[in-house]
Amino acid sequence: MYKRQIERCREILKDETTAILGYGPQGKGQGLNMRDQGFKVIIGLRKGRSWDRALEDGWVEGETLFETEEAASRGTIIQYLLSDAGQIQMWPMVKANLKSSDALYFSHGFGIVFHEHTQIVPPPNVDVILVAPKGSGLTVRTHFQAGRGINSSYAIHQDATGRARDRCIATAFAIGSGHLFETTFEREVHSDLTGERCVLMGMLQGAFLAQYEVLRENGHSPSEAYNETIEEALESLYPLVSEKGMDWMYSNCSTTAQRGALDWAPKFHKALKPVIAECYSSVTSGKEAQISIESNSKADYREKLEQELEAVNNQEMWQAGRQLRPLRPENL
């Protein structure tokens, strides 16, 4: 675990130009934080909506904002923050612009770990490093603005210069990390993909929907089912679990809630662990990567994805949420 020493980071990176390729949530959050802390950072984009957003955020064309290939050629640390599909598409150009002793930086191990599918294999004369914030790009930015920072993992995949660790850790704090813990590219991507499919998103949606449907099938109104399934969890209990831990929550709830949670948690553990183990195996085997890459390469993928997302959007559960969220006290 490392604590931030920002002046030391500035010294390490004083002769570096960080080129951020991509301006999605991570590119934007990391770039703005680096700029605010006085590091030399440029953005590389194709002209379009992301380019316009970058201009609105104060990046200056020809000074700190360049087209992707130009930025790649100017950078000494290339932060490769395009989507997984975008990284595959742009890799030949990026590889051609890597110079000896450059650093290639990722915030996700997908491209490197699943190189058989992505074809992303860096040359041996560059550092290959990773900093993976444990939150969305928006959280990277808002935590930094609040003076908190965000926890991040870091990894060294290839140390061609002997300076990869220093460059990695300095950049981690430059983007707004508060604390760091070491991992590997493999462990990062395996845990990240499993988390997204399970407790962070996939399983969470499934669990919310299952409880909501049971309550509705037994006569509860949409508002009651939503409040007891989602609103209380997200607005009251989960923030306390984050702040104090589940052990504290168990010790500070009603005796009825305490007894029920203690009795039912093992049943959920027994039911869910095999599903999570199946998911983890699918991730580590490369099956999930293959599914993602093959899906993204289909001509009609975007159209079908929009249909899937619209189906979630139209679920009664989330329609109830849209009606109830404006009624929170802070919104009245």
Kindly label every feature range from the protein language model.
Residues M1-Y2:
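Conserved small/polar residues in nucleotide/adenosyl-binding loops
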Residues Y105-R197:
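Rossmann-fold dinucleotide-binding core
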Residues G162-E217, S223-V241:
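Active-site-proximal catalytic alpha-helix in oxidoreductases
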Residues W51, A71-A72, Q87, P222-Y226:
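Small-residue helix-packing motif on alpha-helices
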Residues R46, L55-V113, V121-S136:
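Rossmann-like NAD(P)-binding element
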Residues E217-L332:
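NAD(P)-dependent Rossmann-like dehydrogenase/reductase catalytic/cofactor-binding core
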Residues G29, R35-W59:
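NAD(P)-binding Rossmann-fold cofactor-contacting core
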Residues E16-M34:
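Glycine-rich adenosine-cofactor-binding loop
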